[in-house]
Structure formats: C-alpha cells, structure tokens
Amino acid sequence: MQSYQLLIKVNKDIDLKVGKLGRFIFSIGSYVYTGSAKKNLDKRIERHLSKKKKLHWHIDYLLNNDAVQIIDIKKSEIIECILNKKTNGTIIIKGFGSSDCNLCCGSHLKYLGN
C-alpha cells in the first residue's frame, strides 16, 4: 500500500458539510491531508484533482469546494498513519479521513496555519 499527502490551500473561510461528520468551518490557510491507496495511487490522486466526482470520502467534500485547491502532492512508501503522525499541524476535525486508522491518529487532515 502506498501513501500520499496533499498540501491544500483554502483561499477563504468556508462553512462546509463533510458527509456524516457534520458541518465545519475551514479557516483560510494551508492544510495537509494524508491518505493511501491499496492498488493504484496515481488514480486516487487523479480523482482528488477532479472537481467532478461523487462525494465519497471526507476529503472529497473539502476538495470539491471552489475556494480549495491542491498546491502540492507527495507520494510516500511510509505507512499512512506513521506518515500522518510525523506531520506537524493542528487537528481541527476529529475523525476526518481516519475512519480506518490503526494508530489512533485522531484525524488525517491537519491545519498548518495561514
């Protein structure tokens, strides 16, 4: 399994419903999302880059907003949860992208600041 991180820029404060997690305010600034793909990492990343998709994962709801853009993508061989734990940032939404987390990360989305 390969993992990846998306460096995300939120260009204005947004109020957004994230699936069953609920409604949240995403403040302007930079975020990092850590994810993984069992089979085809490139297809997963390609899906994240598309604005036309069925909203399935928590990250889909954020990336689908016009005020949000992916700034950088980093691929890694490090296990998703270990990579996430090594990443600085503030957890703002508990459970975001971490429903299958094995290391109790709390969230796979971290706020890096403005």
What are these regions (language model features)?
Residues 39-114:
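Aromatic/basic micro-patches that form nucleic-acid/chromatin recognition or nuclease catalytic surfaces
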Residues 24:
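Short, conserved loop/helix-junction motifs that constitute active-site signature segments
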